[in-house]
Structure formats: structure tokens, C-alpha cells
A protein has these predicted regions:
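Single conserved hydrophobic/aromatic residue that forms the stacking wall/gate
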Residues: 157-168
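ATP/adenylate-binding site constellation spanning eukaryotic-like Ser/Thr protein kinases
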Residues: 126, 144, 164
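Active-site beta->alpha loop and helix N-cap motifs at the rims of alpha/beta catalytic domains
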Residues: 14, 19-139
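Catalytic alpha/beta core domains of metabolic enzymes, predominantly
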Residues: 137-159
Length: 168
């Protein structure tokens, strides 16, 4: 389903809000220049600093403007399991092809806590979930063993931004 270059989009702002015109131009720029897929509301898109309304709008606009030309992998992660479920459910209803879910940041969950977090999201949502392991930002590193456990129930993709060569 996902191949090639899937670009993490920035979220442009103007004055006190989302610059929708610039964002739409950015989406079309990537599609017109051969990008394989779009990733709105990820770390590059400043997802932790977006309001819920902004977050949802960024995802909705990306899905609408891409119009099925390329897959959309919506950033829906949160340190709150219920919030991640809510954001993922919204992305699914809006038409996202998958969700990019960052490991819960700040709270430092155990490996079992990480497993339960992703399992709860997977159990409530019907789109593929990509595990986004980025310990330099989230302050938690998902172990390979935890990833292997998660793969047992359809979490088939990982974006691993760990600095450790041994984790590859």
C-alpha cells in the first residue's frame, strides 16, 4: 500500500491561524512533483502544538486536496490514548489511508504501556497504524520486542527515527 517517498508536510501559518492557501499549494506541489504519499500532522507538521480544530482541518484538507491521487497517512498520535483514538477515528472518517501514531511522549510509559496504547487504538479504529518511534522527541524508545508483539495484530508499518544503529 505504501511505497516510495511519503512526505511529512509542514503546517504553514499566517497571522493567528492555519494558512490554508499555502497548505493547499504545498499539497499540490508534492503531488505534481511525484511524491508517493502525504503525511499531514506529524512531527514536521507541528502536531503537538495544533489545536484539535487545526489538527482535524489539516488532515481534512490534505485528504480533500489529494483526492485519492496519493495515499494520506494522517498523524494522529498523542500521549493520551483516548485523544489518539479520537484523532485516528476522525482521520479514518475523513478518508485517511492510515494513521501515523507517535509513541506517547512526556509520560514515559513502560513497554507494556506502549503495547496497550497501540492495541487500544488498533481495537477502536479500522485503518492501518504506523508506529512512529522517535525517542529523541518522545523520550521513550519502543523496543523491538514490543514492536514484534504489536505486529501480531496488523500493525504492519514502522517509522523508526531512533538514533541507535542496533535498533534497525
Amino acid at each position: 500500500m505504501f511505497k516510495g517517498s511519503n512526505v511529512a508536510l509542514i503546517t504553514p501559518f499566517k497571522n493567528n491561524g492555519l494558512d490554508e492557501e499555502a497548505y493547499i499549494k504545498l499539497i499540490h506541489f508534492h503531488i505534481n512533483n511525484g511524491t508517493s504519499g502525504l503525511v499531514p500532522a506529524g512531527t514536521t507538521g507541528e502536531s503537538p502544538t495544533l489545536s484539535h480544530t487545526e489538527h482535524q482541518r489539516v488532515i481534512e484538507l490534505c485528504i480533500k486536496e489529494s483526492n485519492g491521487k496519493v495515499p494520506v497517512i494522517a498523524g494522529t498520535g498523542s500521549n493520551s490514548t483516548e485523544e489518539a483514538i479520537s484523532l485516528t477515528t476522525h482521520a479514518e472518517k475523513a478518508g485517511a489511508n492510515a494513521a501515523l501514531v507517535v509513541t506517547p511522549y512526556y509520560n514515559k510509559p513502560t513497554q507494556e504501556g506502549l503495547y496497550q496504547h497501540y492495541k487500544a487504538i488498533n481495537d477502536k479504529c479500522g485503518i492501518p497504524i504506523l508506529i512512529y518511534n522517535i525517542p529523541s522527541r518522545s523520550v521513550i524508545d519502543m523496543s523491538v520486542d514490543t514492536m514484534a508483539r504489536l505486529y501480531e495484530f496488523c500493525l504492519l508499518y514502522t517509522s523508526d527515527a531512533a538514533d541507535e544503529e542496533d535498533s534497525v
